[in-house]
């Protein structure tokens, strides 16, 4: 009986080994495992015959059966690894990727029209040697008003025009404080522009509580109003892509003397008169002037030795003129249908 069991064990091992070699896929290999090692498999059935063996033969035959199971399991495991590798290679071959094909483009946004205007302004002035400087949006009264020769009784310092904090600080109403801080830190001559957000208590079709402004400043021994006029004429020709007539009107600003407001020929009607320019043929775009001596004194610059000019204009206003936008609020409503046009 013992010899018969040994022959059966060897026969089953040979059958299993041959079947494993012939297996071509994982499903077939799994079926072989069930046929030989499963609950009703050939080796499991063979173990049931141990009851008919003598007490001396049982442990020997039982050990041989377990060795056979381990051997078959090892062959199946090795074959499984081989088949999985072949399966992966076949899948990769069927799903070949052409790495030379262009990738899929992600959906991208576009620059806001005000940002585009800011970049155009920065590009122009940086080519002329102007530094682009920035400063805090929360300011003190000194930098926002006093150093700019704006007295305490000036309307701009009233609560209804300026956003104040409880500690006396405020949201800057212009980017001029950046110029004051720069003049404190640098020695003339220098030239700079200061773009940024500013805040005022105002909201209608042409005004928002927050808007974008850029101011320019030049301090030198030979600064003249004529030089400023020439610069502005060249800037607007660059910005709008054509020569535009400019008109300087006398005005008043506490921080400049003399002061002027600058109008450009209406970009919609070429100066003929339309609704955009209220039929005047002109559009107001900025204020400017020669830096007031008191402003220079406040930052320890001798007004007898150095002179300067300054200007300030709204970037939102320029964006409206450049792109033909008739309502300022459209720039701040985050309407993607509108913004994607730019």
From Swiss-Prot:
Recorded catalytic activity of this chain's protein = tRNA(Phe) + L-phenylalanine + ATP = L-phenylalanyl-tRNA(Phe) + AMP + diphosphate + H(+)
**Where is it found, in Gene Ontology cellular component terms?**
cytoplasm
InterPro entries in alphabetical order:
aa-tRNA-synth_II, aa-tRNA-synth_II/BPL/LPL, Phe-tRNA-synth_IIc_asu, Phe-tRNA_ligase_II_N, Phe_tRNA_ligase_alpha1_bac, Phenylalanyl-tRNA_Synthase, tRNA-bd_arm
The protein's UniProt keywords, in alphabetical order, are:
Aminoacyl-tRNA synthetase, ATP-binding, Cytoplasm, Ligase, Magnesium, Metal-binding, Nucleotide-binding, Protein biosynthesis
Please report a single Pfam family linked to this protein: tRNA-synt_2d
Q: Which cysteines are joined by disulfide bonds?
A: none
Q: Which GO terms describe its molecular function?
A: ATP binding; magnesium ion binding; phenylalanine-tRNA ligase activity; tRNA binding
Q: Which PROSITE patterns match?
A: AA_TRNA_LIGASE_II
Q: How is the cofactor bound?
A: Binds 2 magnesium ions per tetramer.
Which residues are noted in the entry as Mg(2+)-binding? 257
The EC number(s) given in the record are: 6.1.1.20
What compartments host this protein? Cytoplasm
Query: What does this protein need as cofactor?
Result: Mg(2+)
Q: What CDD domains does the annotation carry?
A: PheRS_alpha_core (cd00496)
GO BP: phenylalanyl-tRNA aminoacylation
Q: Which HAMAP family match?
A: Phe_tRNA_synth_alpha1 (MF_00281)
Q: How does it assemble?
A: Tetramer of two alpha and two beta subunits.
Task: Report the family membership.
Answer: Belongs to the class-II aminoacyl-tRNA synthetase family. Phe-tRNA synthetase alpha subunit type 1 subfamily.
Name the record gives this protein = Phenylalanine--tRNA ligase alpha subunit
Which species is this UniProt entry from?
Answer: Legionella pneumophila subsp. pneumophila (strain Philadelphia 1 / ATCC 33152 / DSM 7513)
């Amino acid at each position: 009986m013992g010899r018969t069991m040994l022959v059966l064990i060897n026969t089953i091992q040979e059958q299993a080994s041959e079947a494993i070699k012939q297996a071509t896929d994982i499903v077939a290999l799994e079926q072989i495992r069930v046929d030989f090692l499963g609950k009703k498999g050939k080796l499991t059935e063979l173990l049931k015959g141990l009851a008919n063996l003598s007490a001396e033969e049982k442990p020997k035959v039982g050990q041989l059966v377990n060795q056979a199971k381990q051997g078959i399991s090892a062959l199946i495991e090795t074959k499984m690894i081989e088949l999985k590798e072949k399966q992966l290679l076949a899948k990769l071959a069927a799903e070949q990727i052409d790495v030379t094909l262009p990738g899929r483009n992600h959906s991208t946004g576009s620059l806001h029209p005000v940002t585009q205007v800011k970049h155009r302004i920065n590009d122009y002035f940086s080519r002329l040697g102007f530094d682009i400087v920035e400063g805090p949006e929360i300011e003190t009264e000194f930098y926002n008003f006093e150093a700019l020769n704006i007295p305490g009784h000036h309307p701009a310092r009233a609560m209804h025009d300026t956003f104040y904090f409880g500690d006396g600080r405020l949201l800057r109403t212009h980017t001029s404080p950046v110029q004051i801080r720069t003049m404190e830190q640098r020695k003339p001559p220098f030239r700079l522009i200061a773009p940024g957000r500013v805040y005022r208590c105002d909201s209608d079709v042409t005004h928002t509580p927050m808007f974008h402004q850029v101011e320019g400043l030049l301090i030198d021994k030979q600064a003249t109003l004529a030089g400023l006029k020439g610069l502005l004429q060249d800037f607007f020709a660059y910005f709008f892509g054509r020569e535009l007539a400019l008109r300087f009107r006398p005005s008043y600003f506490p921080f400049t003397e003399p002061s002027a407001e600058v109008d450009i020929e209406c970009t919609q009607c070429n100066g003929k008169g339309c609704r955009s320019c209220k039929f005047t043929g002109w559009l107001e775009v900025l204020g400017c002037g020669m830096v007031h001596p008191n402003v220079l004194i406040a930052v320890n610059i001798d007004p007898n030795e150095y002179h300067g000019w300054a200007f300030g204009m709204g970037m939102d206003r320029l964006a409206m003129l450049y792109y033909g936008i008739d309502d300022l609020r459209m720039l701040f409503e985050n309407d993607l249908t509108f913004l994607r046009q730019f």
